[in-house]
Amino acid sequence: MASGGGSLGLIVFLLLLQPKPCEAWAAASVLSTSGFPSGFSEAPRDNPPPPTRVRMSKATTRSPFMNFSLVCGQPFMKIMGGVDAEEGKWPWQVSVRVRHMHVCGGSLINSQWVLTAAHCIYSRIQYNVKVGDRSVYRQNTSLVIPIKTIFVHPKFSTTIVVKNDIALLKLQHPVNFTTNIYPVCIPSESFPVKAGTKCWVTGWGKLVPGAPDVPTEILQEVDQNVILYEECNEMLKKATSSSVDLVKRGMVCGYKERGKDACQGDSGGPMSCEFENKWVQVGVVSWGISCGRKGYPGVYTDVAFYSKWLIAVVNQADCLHPVVFLVLLLCSLTS
């Protein structure tokens, strides 16, 4: 009927007049459409440094965490020392996979989003993630979920040095939180992690450099101390006799004694630090020179530095679909 069509047209017109929360963010992210170096053996760095325990300044009254999830950073298991991670210690840790093959780590930041490194992503490849199990092979408590959409930072580059090495993966469907599946907290831009903070890096990467490109079966954990990018840059320039700045803003480093580091296969995984009884992801495993070499810190993407980009991508992706769904629903009701 003509009157029904007119009403629908008016409703759609009014919807289009409404300000869209995502519009301001539309240029903040890009869908991954071009190839990037990735994979278990090809990651530019797959050799990042371990984390440290977060110490934060309390001068600000703003929340130190971004609102990606109503709950985050409080696993049911307590974190303790060791090499193999106990079941449920790091419930935000995920394995980013191609078919059944582990290629990189990642972290669950809410029920439908995973944070990883941009260098882990190739275009035109179907990825999935495995969540909920410390074993990279077994599926006792785990789920394998296809990736719906991939967002790589638009300024990601591997020219001279790796820059803007961060990406977001939207899952095909949300997961339910359990003792083995739980998101990590994401720091706000004002989150001031201090040098020397003790954090932990986790992953299924190589235990020793030069080992076969096969992931370790059981999730590994290693503690590291945070080094801010200025000091880290000087350390790596000295170690490599380079005059080029290798570590810049947007990066953070981790270092402990020789032999304690991330390695190939750990890329994209989290550097997690405890703050006020919550675990916050300070870094994303990005790159390094060899693994666990004395005087060579591992380099991570600084998550707090990119927090606005992260929230922009999630807002844009999550607000687009409800409007489309509403218009389609109205069409079906009036047809």
Curated annotation (Swiss-Prot):
Pfam families: Trypsin. Glycans are attached at residues 67, 140, 176. The active site is at residues 119, 165, 267. Its EC number is 3.4.21.-. Testis-specific. Mainly detected in round spermatids at all the eminiferous epithelial stages (at protein level). Residues 79-315 form the Peptidase S1 domain. GO terms for biological process: germ cell development; proteolysis; spermatogenesis. Residues 1-24 form the signal peptide. It is a lipid-anchor; GPI-anchor. Disulfide bonds join 104-120, 199-273, 232-253, 263-291. InterPro entries: Peptidase_S1_PA, Peptidase_S1_PA_chymotrypsin, Peptidase_S1A, Trypsin_dom, TRYPSIN_HIS, TRYPSIN_SER. Belongs to the peptidase S1 family. This is Serine protease 42. It comes from Mus musculus.
